């Protein structure tokens, strides 16, 4: 199931999965999401607005339940950021708190534009399940102004450099997430 919370790249994620011959539902119905064998939280937008929408549609507890019951879960872009405690983008707004860490603004650096838009190579940790059979230093496409600083380095599956060290992907049990 792809979670529909009025924020995100739903159609591009749906199209990508269909091109891989996957059965796809796009839903904000908690019972449908809880019955799915895999769940994706996509995202493009602002942290605070996205959390408000998840709350408005009654999806906060649904997402927490999905991640607790061992269903494979993937957060993409803003979907990664929402899994954590808080974001500098919306001070005072609480994230889902499923994983520990914070979302920080990419610091300005001469010669680098923010938002970060473009291809960067990622340093893949050898134990990363999500990137099995993907070569280290592969290039992925980023569009973001905020980055993850995970509290526990053990959950970091891949990282990159852009003005600072960025935790680009994380894995914890059945929960996977990528900033790209």
Where are the model-predicted features located?
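N-terminal beta1-alpha1 ligand-phosphate binding loop
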Residues: 1-22, 180
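Generic structural signal for residues in well-ordered beta-strands
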Residues: 24-26, 103
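Structural alpha-helical scaffold elements that stabilize or flank donor/cofactor-binding regions
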Residues: 32-33, 66, 169
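An anion/phosphate-binding loop that grips the pyrophosphate of nucleotide cofactors and donors
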Residues: 36
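Cysteine-nucleophile active-site neighborhood
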Residues: 45-118
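Pocket-forming structural segment of enzyme catalytic cores
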Residues: 86-162
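A glycine-centered loop/beta-turn motif at secondary-structure junctions
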Residues: 151-152, 160-180
